[in-house]
């Protein structure tokens, strides 16, 4: 016999977790804002600091690489010391590093400060998903993650617009200075509104962190510098060395029986595994496309940073409007068909855009594929996050969110590095003078990368051809979605749980809360009804893991893995014997 337990009044954040969510979104918003702002400012930074294309790309890649590496351990650090504490540390580091970026007088100092920024962002981001997973029940998590996606979309809109206006009026340094007051406000809100969740003891696999960091750095460095080094043998040796480090990292995680950096059990969930593949694909495509489109808009079309930002605005507006509705849809239905639709629109929109990237294309024709990209983003980001986290056990929340975000950042940094190599090769093939023509004018008054008239057409062709890479990669997202869609409908539970399901709602999430967060003055009432056979069968795995996942979430219950342990209690007891 089990008990139905009412939480005490002190646990208000489980009943109303929204203030904590909005407090966390301030820091998340600032990180997303920073990414889009720098993309718009890259041509101006390149012109004013008198640096070449290969160097300015490191302003983005260094940040993304430093962002990705600590996220693997940041989830565990959040579990050990509390996600609130790690969030505050990450936001503080990011804010101070933003000040350093704005004070930079050269490319070296700017890139170094961007690395510190990335570390702060890497510590902060996993705490948002981990906290959402722990304070929102499964049946409300889709709406919460829809709001999370809306914040990202709004940042994608505000970031380029604000960044373009700041670059045009005050200089590129102010795209970093603006983070300082926002960061201070975010720290104050987080300190008061984010709950202090229970800590879990963890060991930290620092050897694994070193292996993964070395592997990712070598791969990214080889890809990004390969074209400029004419793909000499030492470049290939660097890339192979990076792959070797990553292979050793995977082997070490499999052998580490104490507590691996990545608990491989999270990949037993097919949804989580394929969601990681697809988040890497969308991050690769999204980050990769920003580089050629931004350079095309400013160097070929002659748009200012502000006008370039306006060109991206339809994507953010459409994505922000649709994201909450998509969140409600996936709370009530299987998200896998939604993902297939989203990735299809993404591939079509990118192909459409590359066909329009010519010197004489009217601006209104460029806006149309950007609208389609907004539709694609709304139908990809939130469904991916919900699919990845819906079945995860609470004690894996920190590690799994760290893995998910690290894979996303790894996809982004690989997209940036691969695009750097691909763009450089296309520029060398299409333009007289090759990459040297991209150094642009020097001087503090240069805000737009200016090209001679006779090279604008070949440069536009090079940028258009560069868009083939993210468009091609987006196709793999469609393939990944098809692997999960069961056209016979067997993947979705056909019979819901009975209305009177006894103690079928006492899943691992409830047990976790009762064990980790005991409350005083809780009223307990014994439930006399026995577990229905249908509910017990679904909990034991009948119908497959997807059937368990979507049938429980449809009933508004936090999902638990199949095969939960049976409580052994006397029929006259008022509490489970395990408690």
Swiss-Prot record:
Membrane topology: Multi-pass membrane protein
Region (Disordered): 516-579
GO cellular component, one term: membrane
Bias (Low complexity): 526-540
Single GO molecular function: transmembrane transporter activity
PROSITE patterns noted in UniProt: MFS
Sequence intervals crossing the membrane: 20-40, 54-74, 86-106, 142-162, 174-194, 204-224, 234-254, 279-299, 310-330, 335-355, 366-386, 467-487
Keyword vocabulary terms for this entry: Cell membrane, Membrane, Transmembrane, Transmembrane helix, Transport
Subcellular location: Cell membrane
Gene3D superfamilies recorded: MFS general substrate transporter like domains, Multidrug resistance protein D
Domain of life: Bacteria
Pfam families: MFS_1
Composition bias type Polar residues, residue spans: 570-579
SUPFAM superfamilies assigned: MFS general substrate transporter
Family: Belongs to the major facilitator superfamily. EmrB family.
PANTHER family for the chain: EXPORT PROTEIN, MAJOR FACILITATOR SUPERFAMILY MULTIDRUG TRANSPORTER MFSC
The protein's name: Uncharacterized MFS-type transporter Rv1250
UniProt source species: Mycobacterium tuberculosis (strain ATCC 25618 / H37Rv)
């Amino acid at each position: 016999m089990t008990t139905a337990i009412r939480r005490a009044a002190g646990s208000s954040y489980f009943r109303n977790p929204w203030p904590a969510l909005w407090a966390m979104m301030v820091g998340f918003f600032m990180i997303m804002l920073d990414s889009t702002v720098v993309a718009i400012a890259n041509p101006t930074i390149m012109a004013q600091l008198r640096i070449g294309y290969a160097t300015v790309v490191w302003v983005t890649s260094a940040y993304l690489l430093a962002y990705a590496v600590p996220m693997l351990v940041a989830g565990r650090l959040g579990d050990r010391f509390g996600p609130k504490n790690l969030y505050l540390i990450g936001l503080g580091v990011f804010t101070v590093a933003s000040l350093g970026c704005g004070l930079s007088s050269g490319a070296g100092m700017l890139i170094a400060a961007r690395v510190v920024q990335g570390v702060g962002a890497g510590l902060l981001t996993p705490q948002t998903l981990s906290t959402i997973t722990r304070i929102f029940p499964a049946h409300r998590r889709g709406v919460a993650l829809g709001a999370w996606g809306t914040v990202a979309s709004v940042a994608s809109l505000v970031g380029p617009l604000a960044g373009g206006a700041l670059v045009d009026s005050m200089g590129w340094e102010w795209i970093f200075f603006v983070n300082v007051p926002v960061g201070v406000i975010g720290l104050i809100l987080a300190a008061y509104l984010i709950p202090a969740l229970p800590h879990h003891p963890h060991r930290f696999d620092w050897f694994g962190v070193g292996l993964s960091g070395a592997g990712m750095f070598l791969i990214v460095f080889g890809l990004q510098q390969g074209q400029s080094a004419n793909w000499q043998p030492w470049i290939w040796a660097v890339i192979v060395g990076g792959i070797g480090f990553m292979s050793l990292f995977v082997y070490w995680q499999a052998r580490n029986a104490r507590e691996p950096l990545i608990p491989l059990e999270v990949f037993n969930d097919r949804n989580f595994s394929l969601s990681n593949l697809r988040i890497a694909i969308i991050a690769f495509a999204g980050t990769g496309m920003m580089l050629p489109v931004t350079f095309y808009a400013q160097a070929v079309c002659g748009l200012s940073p502000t006008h370039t930002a306006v060109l991206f605005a339809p994507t953010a507006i459409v994505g922000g409007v649709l994201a909450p509705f998509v969140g409600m849809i996936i709370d009530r239905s299987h998200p896998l068909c939604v993902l297939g639709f989203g990735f299809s629109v993404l591939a079509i929109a990118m192909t459409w855009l590359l066909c329009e990237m010519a010197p004489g294309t009217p601006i209104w024709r460029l806006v149309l594929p950007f609208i389609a990209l907004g539709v694609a983003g709304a139908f990809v980001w939130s469904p991916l996050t919900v699919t990845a986290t819906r079945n995860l056990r609470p004690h894996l929340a920190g590690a799994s969110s760290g893995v998910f975000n690290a894979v996303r950042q790894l996809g982004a940094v690989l997209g940036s590095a691969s695009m750097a190599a691909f763009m450089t090769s296309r520029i060398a093939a299409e333009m007289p003078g090759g990459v040297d023509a991209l150094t642009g004018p020097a001087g503090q008054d240069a805000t737009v990368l200016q090209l001679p008239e006779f090279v604008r057409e070949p440069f536009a062709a090079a940028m258009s051809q560069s868009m083939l890479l993210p468009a091609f990669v987006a196709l793999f997202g469609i393939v990944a979605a098809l692997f999960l869609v069961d056209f016979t409908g067997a993947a979705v539970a056909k019979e819901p749980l009975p209305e009177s399901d006894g103690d079928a709602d006492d899943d691992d999430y409830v047990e976790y809360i009762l064990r980790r967060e005991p409350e005083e003055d809780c009223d307990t009432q014994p439930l006399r009804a026995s577990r229905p056979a249908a509910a017990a069968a679904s909990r034991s795995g009948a119908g497959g893991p997807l059937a368990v996942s979507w049938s429980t979430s449809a009933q508004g219950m936090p999902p638990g893995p199949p095969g939960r342990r049976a409580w052994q209690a006397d029929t006259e007891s008022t509490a489970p014997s395990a408690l």
